[in-house]
Amino acid sequence: MSGDTCLCPASGAKPKISGFKGGGLGNKYVQLNVGGSLHYTTVRALTRHDTMLKAMFSGRMEVLTDKEGWILIDRCGKHFGTILNYLRDDTVTLPQSRQEIQELMAEAKYYLIQGLVSLCQAALQDKKDSYQPVCNIPIITSLREEDRLIESSTKPVVKLLYNRSNNKYSYTSNSDDHLLKNIELFDKLSLRFNGRVLFIKDVIGDEICCWSFYGQGRKLAEVCCTSIVYATEKKQTKVEFPEARIYEETLNVLLYETPRVPDNSLLEATSRSRSQASPSEDEDTFELRDRVRRIHVKRYSTYDDRQLGHQSAHRD
């Protein structure tokens, strides 16, 4: 499992360097902090291939740990989950973008994972003669397709639904202009954040103009831009352009760029090996975990009052 939060050690606490005694611990879970991205996996997975990670976890190289027992690796953790998947299965689905494949290959070279380097090189060669657009905006064709896009996306999702034909009444004088401004803002945001957010257009929905924001597979917020007003004794449809609110929700959704933080139960289960630590260290550890949980819940409570435990735990 991987996450996105790394809290700095307490003031005065220094990471310590030691040799990792990995003999006979193939099924033991270890916790890794790779550039702030938290991961759980077994020693067996890390030592299956002759790589730098095998050297680290078989005692041939020194490892750096903090006071909570996290093994620190000073690399970007963006693609480390993909690296773990390759180490376990000897194969992996590569990213679609050329840039991300290059980033993954750089990490694979650092960890001396030659098989993954070869996969990346072959994928880059395949893409060499074909040009992929930098900014792709899917237009959904069905509700099922929309659900699959949102659930499978590793990025936050922003969807704009606009369908002018859904109107039952006449429009107010500024509605067409506001509808166009919503579409133009969507295009501008798509160009600005296309590498960090998946933008989706919906032209078959039941609304006239509505923004939806998703993170980690669930809806976080919705901004509906239409309302019914009464003018000259008849109903009219009014389309608004809440620009500030749209910007606010787009920035909020960026909080969900990185994978889920490990939940509290998994943190406790994987830390039992340190049960011999002093009482003061145990108290500090539980206080730190609780702080991670509260920050995480606070971040979600803006949109969803469900407890953090609603997500099932997975282990790398």
UniProtKB/Swiss-Prot annotation:
Keyword Thylakoid: no
Keywords, alphabetical: Cytoplasm, Endosome, Nucleus, Phosphoprotein, Ubl conjugation pathway
Record's compositionally biased regions (Polar residues): 268-279
GO BP, sorted A to Z: cell migration; immune response; negative regulation of Rho protein signal transduction; positive regulation of DNA replication; proteasome-mediated ubiquitin-dependent protein catabolic process; protein homooligomerization; protein ubiquitination; stress fiber assembly
Similarity remark: Belongs to the BACURD family.
PTM field: Phosphorylation at Ser-280 by CK2 facilitates the nucleus localization and increases interaction with PCNA.
Main localization category: cytoplasm
GO cellular component: Cul3-RING ubiquitin ligase complex; cytoplasm; endosome; nucleus
Gene name of this polypeptide: Tnfaip1
Species, as recorded: Rattus norvegicus (Rat)
A molecular function GO annotation: cyclin binding
Pfam families: BTB_2
Name assigned to this protein: BTB/POZ domain-containing adapter for CUL3-mediated RhoA degradation protein 2
Subunit structure and binding partners: Component of the BCR(TNFAIP1) E3 ubiquitin ligase complex, at least composed of CUL3, TNFAIP1/BACURD2 and RBX1. Interacts with RHOA; with a preference for RhoA-GDP. Interacts with RHOB. Interacts with CSNK2B. Interacts with PCNA.
Pathway: Protein modification; protein ubiquitination
Function per UniProt: Substrate-specific adapter of a BCR (BTB-CUL3-RBX1) E3 ubiquitin-protein ligase complex involved in regulation of cytoskeleton structure. The BCR(TNFAIP1) E3 ubiquitin ligase complex mediates the ubiquitination of RHOA, leading to its degradation by the proteasome, thereby regulating the actin cytoskeleton and cell migration. Its interaction with RHOB may regulate apoptosis. May enhance the PCNA-dependent DNA polymerase delta activity.
Domain (BTB) ranges: 28-96
InterPro entries (UniProt xref): BACURD1-3, BTB/POZ_dom, SKP1/BTB/POZ_sf, T1-type_BTB
Residues where Phosphoserine is found: S278, S280
Stretches for region Disordered: 268-287
Subcellular location: Cytoplasm; Nucleus; Endosome
